[in-house]
Regions:
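A small/polar active-site loop signature that marks catalytic segments
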Residues: 1-103
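C-terminal soluble interaction/assembly domains
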Residues: 68-203
Length: 203
């Protein structure tokens, strides 16, 4: 017989997702993923079971994603067991690119930050989300080349052996280990930027 006293409506999911991607908020990613799982299967309560439900939906809705390599232990990716291949992520981008979102029927790039190229004269526009850990760097989204050609892309740079060594190193928070890891990240970012600028100029 209880009656509600007050209710608070959240912002539209599209707006929440924009902030999530802008600030890389892992808690928001977990909560959105769990809410999605509960919508698909009421009663889901844990992050692991929620990730399994969403992965099952992906397998049915976008079979290429799971077929090409999508193993998620949770919804944020902050787990050593999580593995996603470039091909699987590209399949997800293609699915997103074929749809429109929100009341304004916007393309999926409305979710992503527009990034400028570091060098002058590269041309083009970049809408992408990056992910960074020591010995792992990725970026995915859409590149609009200087010629006006839209390209979906996924770039991943990973050193699995160095990452495993870093995780198993008791001194990983000490300066020498951190310095080496940061050097690797700088090289990965430079390579990533060079590839994207080359595509922007030549394709």
């Amino acid at each position: 017989g209880a009656e509600p006293v007050a209710a608070h409506e959240s912002r539209a999911m599209l707006e929440i997702a924009v902030d999530l991607l802008e600030y890389s908020n892992n808690l928001s990613a977990e909560l959105i993923g769990l809410a999605t799982a509960q919508k698909l299967k009421p009663g889901v309560s844990s992050l692991a079971s929620g990730a399994a439900v969403v992965r099952g939906w992906l397998g049915k809705t976008i079979p290429d994603v799971t077929r090409l390599g999508w193993q998620s232990a949770n919804q944020s990716g902050l787990a050593g067991q999580t593995r996603v291949t470039p091909a699987a992520l590209l399949a997800l981008l293609r699915f997103a690119d074929a749809r429109r979102y929100g009341a304004g029927q916007a393309p999926f790039t409305v979710l992503l930050r527009e990034t400028e190229f570091a060098s002058q004269g590269a041309g083009g526009r970049l809408y992408a989300k990056s992910g960074t850990m020591f010995y792992a760097r990725g970026q995915a989204g859409q590149l609009l080349t200087a010629s006006g050609r839209p390209l979906l892309f996924v770039l991943m740079h990973t050193d699995f052996a160095s990452r495993a060594g870093y995780e198993g190193n008791a001194a990983r928070y000490k300066a020498p280990v951190q310095i080496r890891a940061n050097r690797w990240l700088r090289r990965a970012r430079v390579a990533e930027q060079a590839i994207l600028e080359y595509w922007a100029k030549t394709l």
